Amino acid sequence: MAPVALLVIDLQRGVNDPSWGPRNNPSCEANIGALLDAWRSEAQPIVYVRHDSIEPGSTLRPGQPGNDLHEMLADEPDLLVTKHVSSAFFGEPDLAEWLRSRQIERVVMCGVQTNMCCESTARVGSNLGFDVRFVLEATHTHDRPAPDGGMIDADTLARVTAANLDPELCRVVTTAEAIEELGARAPEPARGLS
């Protein structure tokens, strides 16, 4: 079986800080857990991505407790990428180089925020020639202000991300579909986005 990398993007303690506002998909972490279990059981590569914000006051700034990875990511990954921009492909070490050196062509993405770092990483990964799977129900995001002064709720942002990506840039899949494609049998994932 060709290796398939799981990218867990920005699942850090600070993303659930109340300052981020209301979020969607309370099943996100359970679905990420199901993906991690499947990847570990198949001995497939796992990449954690950590956002090291350079913004003053950010909960994800290095040295802040919110910069730490979520406790469910306590196991050592095959690679830890750190970044301060939205795409994991512009972090350190070079993610594309690492994947290519291991003949990894397919990447499965999950994490936070659906419409920001996850979408950006999916777009760049696709542009670089990787076969991308985007596990929408294993991502979450937060309500966001619109330029016109209104608010866009997190569920709408997630749906728009899925429409933006699939089918031109990647395939949006469920947790179960990602696990089935991997060939693993893992615990039944939690369902839904809300």
Q: What is the predicted function of each stretch?
A:
Residues 2-5, 31-37, 41-42, 59-194:
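Active-site-adjacent betaalpha module
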Residues 7-11:
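N-terminal nucleotide-binding beta1-loop-alpha1 segment
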Residues 13-18:
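Short acidic, Gly/Ser-rich segments with clustered Asp/Glu that frequently serve as metal-coordination loops
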Residues 19-26, 57-60, 149-151:
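Short glycine-enriched, charge-decorated loop/helix-capping segments at active-site entrances
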Residues 20-48:
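A short alpha/beta connector and helix-capping loop motif
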Residues 43-46, 52-54, 58:
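Early exported N-terminus immediately downstream of N-terminal targeting peptides
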